[in-house]
C-alpha cells in the first residue's frame, strides 16, 4: 500500500521524468507510453465554485439543447478514473472498466507498487480522473464545473501509471478492449513518440477501431517550445484526431506540439477539472485539450447516430474557430467550437474545406482562479518541461515570445493566402 509520502514521491518522479521518457525511442512494444502532462495538485482538493473559462466560452444551455452525449460511451485510456469523486461516480461504467497494468509491479527499490482495482477505478496519479471530468463530469452542488458531455458514459481503462509501466503493446490492447466494450469515442491523452518509425502493433489497433466507426482523439504532445516539431503517436496516425492546446485568446499554447498532423485545437491552459477523492484543480497540457474535443465528438455522435467517424471529425474541423482559410501546423483547422459543431450540421461532410468558417471570435473574459495557491505553487504548476540536448529544462516564461511569433506567422500567412 502506498503511503502519502510514496504518492508525493511518485508525482515528483513523474514531473522530473515525463518529458525525458516521451522522447525515448518507443517503437518497441515494451517502451513506456507516458502521460503527456504530469500535473501538480494535491488530492483531494477543494471545490472550484465558479464557471471555468474553458466553459465560459461556450453557450452551454444552447449546446445541451442539441445534445448531452446520452447513449455514447467514451473510453478513457489513461491512469484510471477515481469513482470516489461525486461528479464522476454516476458517469463511469465501472463494470466495463479494465486494468491493463502488469501484475507484481515493483519500483526501483524493489518495493511492491499498488496496481489498483481490476476495473480501472483507481487513480493515484490523477491524470485519468482529470481527463474523465472534462468529458463527462455530472453537474455538482457548489461548483460551476461540469463535463461538456454530461450524459456520456465513461469506460475507465487503466493502462499507465506514474512509473511508465504502460507500453505501446498495452495501449494497443486498451484500444481493442475499448472497441469490445462498445466505445463510440476513445480518448488517448498520452503519446509514444518515435521520429523514425511508428509501432505496427499500435497502428493495427487504431485501424481496427476506425473500421468500427470509433472516433479516436489523441493529444498532440507538449514539446512545442522553441518551435520544436516532431510527430507523436498515436496522434499522427491517419484517422486519429490530434489535438493541440489553445489559450484564452484562441492562440496556440506555447508548449503545444505543432506539426502537419495536428487536426484541431482546444483549451489547454489553466483547465479546471476533477481530481481523485473529490474537488478540482487547474492543469495545463494537450492532455486536457484532447478530452475537450472528445466530449464534443460524443455530443455530435449522440445527435447523429448514423454519421461515420470520419464525418464527425470533419464536422468538428469545419466548424472550428480559425483565423486562416485552411489548416495550419499550430492549431490544425482551428479551435473547436462546440455550439457551431452541433448547430451547423444540416448534412454530414467527409472532409473539411478551406475558405468558409473563418470566425476569429473574440475570446471571453477569463474567470479568476481561486485554488488557494501561493505564487510559487502557481509558477510551479505552469512550468513546462522540455528536452534540449538530453537535459530537462523548466521553461515558464518563454511562452509569450512563442505566442507572439505564432501570431506574426499567422498574419503573414493570412496576407499571403497560404498555410505553414
Labelled PLM ranges:
Residues 1-36, 386-406:
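Secretory targeting and sorting signals
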Residues 37-151, 180:
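Active-site core segment of subtilase-fold serine proteases
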Residues 78, 144-162, 186, 308-320:
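Short helix-loop-beta-strand segments that form the rim/entrance of peptidase-like active sites
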Residues 103-113, 245-287:
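Catalytic-core environment of secreted peptidases
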Residues 132-135, 268-336:
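Hydrolase catalytic cores
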Residues 159-233, 279-284:
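Substrate-binding/access-modulating region of protease and related hydrolase catalytic domains
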Residues 187, 304-401, 416-418:
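C-terminal subdomain of the subtilisin-like protease fold in secreted/lumenal serine endopeptidases
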Residues 409-420:
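Cytoplasmic C-terminal tails of single-pass
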Amino acid at each position: 500500500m502506498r503511503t502519502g509520502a510514496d504518492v508525493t514521491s511518485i508525482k515528483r518522479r513523474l514531473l522530473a521524468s515525463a518529458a525525458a521518457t516521451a522522447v525515448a525511442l518507443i517503437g518497441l512494444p515494451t517502451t513506456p507510453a507516458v502521460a503527456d502532462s504530469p500535473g501538480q495538485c494535491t488530492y483531494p482538493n477543494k471545490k472550484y465554485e465558479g464557471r471555468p473559462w474553458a466553459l465560459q466560452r461556450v453557450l452551454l444551455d444552447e449546446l445541451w439543447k442539441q445534445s448531452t452525449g446520452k447513449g455514447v460511451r467514451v473510453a478513457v485510456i489513461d491512469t484510471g478514473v477515481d469513482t470516489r469523486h461525486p461528479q464522476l461516480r454516476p458517469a463511469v461504467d465501472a463494470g466495463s472498466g479494465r486494468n491493463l497494468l502488469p501484475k507484481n509491479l515493483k519500483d526501483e527499490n524493489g518495493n511492491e507498487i499498488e496496481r489498483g482495482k481490476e476495473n480501472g477505478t483507481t487513480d493515484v496519479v490523477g491524470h485519468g480522473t482529470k481527463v474523465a471530468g472534462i468529458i463527462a463530469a455530472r453537474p455538482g452542488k457548489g461548483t460551476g464545473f461540469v463535463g461538456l458531455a454530461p450524459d456520456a458514459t465513461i469506460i475507465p481503462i487503466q493502462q499507465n501509471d506514474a512509473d511508465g509501466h504502460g507500453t505501446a503493446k498495452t495501449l494497443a490492447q486498451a484500444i481493442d478492449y475499448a472497441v469490445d466494450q462498445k466505445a463510440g469515442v476513445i480518448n488517448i491523452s498520452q503519446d509514444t513518440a518515435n521520429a523514425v518509425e511508428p509501432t505496427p502493433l499500435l497502428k493495427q489497433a487504431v485501424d481496427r477501431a476506425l473500421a468500427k466507426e470509433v472516433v479516436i482523439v489523441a493529444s498532440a504532445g507538449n514539446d512545442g517550445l522553441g518551435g520544436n516539431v516532431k510527430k507523436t503517436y498515436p496522434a499522427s496516425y491517419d484517422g486519429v484526431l490530434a489535438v493541440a492546446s489553445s489559450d484564452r485568446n484562441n492562440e496556440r499554447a506555447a508548449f503545444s506540439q505543432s506539426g502537419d498532423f495536428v487536426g484541431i485545437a482546444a483549451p489547454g491552459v489553466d483547465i479546471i477539472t476533477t481530481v481523485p477523492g473529490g474537488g478540482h484543480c487547474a492543469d495545463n497540457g494537450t492532455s486536457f485539450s484532447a478530452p475537450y474535443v472528445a466530449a464534443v465528438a460524443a455530443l455530435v455522435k449522440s445527435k447523429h447516430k448514423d454519421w461515420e467517424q470520419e464525418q464527425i471529425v470533419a464536422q468538428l474541423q469545419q466548424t472550428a474557430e480559425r483565423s486562416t482559410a485552411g489548416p495550419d501546423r499550430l492549431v490544425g483547422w482551428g479551435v473547436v467550437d462546440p455550439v457551431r459543431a452541433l448547430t451547423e450540421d444540416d448534412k454530414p461532410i467527409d472532409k473539411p474545406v478551406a475558405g468558409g468558417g473563418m470566425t476569429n471570435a473574440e475570446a471571453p473574459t477569463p474567470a479568476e482562479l481561486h485554488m488557494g495557491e501561493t505564487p510559487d505553487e502557481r509558477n510551479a504548476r505552469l512550468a513546462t518541461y522540455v528536452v534540449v540536448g538530453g537535459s530537462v529544462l523548466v521553461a515558464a516564461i518563454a511562452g509569450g515570445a512563442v505566442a507572439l511569433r505564432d501570431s506574426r506567422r499567422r498574419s503573414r500567412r493570412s496576407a499571403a493566402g497560404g498555410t505553414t
